Amino acid sequence: MDKTTANRKTLTIHEVLWSNIAMPLTGRTPIAFPLTVIWTLVYLSFLALGGVDSVGWLNNGLVVPAVAMPLTVLLFLEWGALALSRKAAILVALCGLLFWGITAYFIHSTGDWRFWQTLNTVALLGTTFTAGSWLAEEILEPVHLIPVCIVAAAVDILSVMFGPSAKLGEHVIFYLENATRNFASGLPLDPPPALNLLLLHWPRPGTTVMAPLLGVGDLVFIAFFLGACRRFELPLFRATFLLLLGLGISLLLAQFFHKPMPVLPFICGLFLLGNLPALRTRSS
């Protein structure tokens, strides 16, 4: 055992999550591509279970986010280890938008729309990842994250109550009500309208209904916060925990009130509360 290994401190879970120790990404092997394959296979597996009756506890709506949201955050976390230059990020984002548009077209022009929605979801994740990571690189000082979080949370609240997100929520609720009725009656499910493709959906086992989870802005900010952790050497695992906690709270409230809830106030608020001392220290 060398001197470096002997002097290395063993961190407890509490210290990893709540100390201001930065968790560098250097010297590690990113598993971004294998994780993308795993994410897609799990998605397809849930999709295959859509036609299976009596799958028991899998019918519970909470199983979907319990699997999908941690996988999505981990996907952003791993791809965030591969920092892109500004030109590369713009190129990847444009390619992602093009691929998203192509798959959206085939969703509404072919009978096998579920296959194309799988690819559309991957394109949505790729585009939002590069957008969020690029925006994180444009932040000059860690303390600038504070007003960004405050403004983003306020805008999200107004959007969900009165703005575009409110309109999108109406479309989603209308589509889900029709889809649920069609499923109960044994009728085929129509493809989702174009606006619904701006949401991350996940197949719900035991039904043919796709469960909406997160919007474009939510996905961008997940990538943004993880990119900011990499850029300013903020505690990465703590940020991941806080993001998942915020997503979980917003989802539970949406389930309880049976209406769309703003996500950014929870993930932005928890991110600030957990990292405020570190943001001030690294900006001084």
Put a short name on every predicted segment:
Residues 12-284:
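A membrane-topology feature that recognizes alpha-helical transmembrane segments
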